[in-house]
Amino acid sequence: MQAKEEKEFTLQERRCLIVWVYTLKPLKQLRRYGLIHYVSRKMKYVVIYMNEENIESNMEKINQLHFVRSVDKSYRPDVEMNFAEKIGTKAAYQEQEDDGYVVEELSTEIRLAENV
């Protein structure tokens, strides 16, 4: 028996487009550009996921369709999602002094509106 070669898994970079449409009837035309994740019938928009390298070319093609009002790119991959250093950790409240770091601990209590 031959040993099977294992391929290393690489995470595919993906991004979503929000496509605002005039009507939802020709919705099947959008399937060729990516995975349709959500359709809002009330607000008339479609969320499509596709590979990152195809975003710019597909945005131009989708925008030229007759039933498309506008196309917006999702900025979620660009937003820093690590909030551990922002709120409630010791690293967020370090102040540098002459002899090193002094940690100033602050109370980070979250109160709900119904308990106030």
Swiss-Prot record:
Note the superkingdom of the native organism. Bacteria
Q: Which UniProt keywords apply?
A: Cytoplasm
List the subcellular locations.
Cytoplasm
Principal subcellular localization: cytoplasm
One Pfam family matching this protein: DUF2129
- Key word Transport present: no
Q: Which InterPro entries does its entry note?
A: DUF2129
Q: What GO CC annotations are associated with the protein?
A: cytoplasm
HAMAP family attached here?
Answer: UPF0298
Concerning its family, UniProt says: Belongs to the UPF0298 family.
What is the name attached to this protein's record? UPF0298 protein EF_2453
